[in-house]
């Protein structure tokens, strides 16, 4: 009891002593000058700060490094990850798609849900590209559709330009103008032709900050630019050393050039 009383008295004394502390501020007196390089930005690829965040790419897992994550078969198509006859040495996986029972009125294919859905805005234009190779039985076109989250509404559609080659990988492209909006939309790649397809590096971009190719989200990038940073630390944090191993650490030299 005596020890408890002493402890209580000491605590009370400390609180009184803290309460007596005062601070005086002279608003007319200028303090130390802050250097022009004191404030800047720090970027670490964590919690989707880049992919799904500042980076404007709408397709999640576009090169299938994460297996079939965010990809699904549509209308009875059969999909599987493949590591054979890849696009190039930089790629480690591709998506194999087997289609049977398809027709012009019964198209089949694959869907990508993006990062928590794709924010599709009416009257906005989206740039689509992908690499593809087909079997000898495939001879047709690929149609891209932007769909609502529930799949019941088409938000935009386009036929990809280019040829599906049976010997080598070819790049197909399309521009899609949205006719309706859905903050959690999805991308569908469809065909009415039966056969086998290998697909890789599927990319869908909205308008980017300063209209730069393969660029940044305009809203987020402009907010950062408006802070007028003196510098950008990139990469920052543990991202620079990789996840568990230096083998997957960020290597900026490998980011130069086409995304594929």
Where are these regions (language model features)?
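Extracellular and organelle-lumenal recognition/adhesion modules and their flexible linkers in secreted
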Residues: 20-260
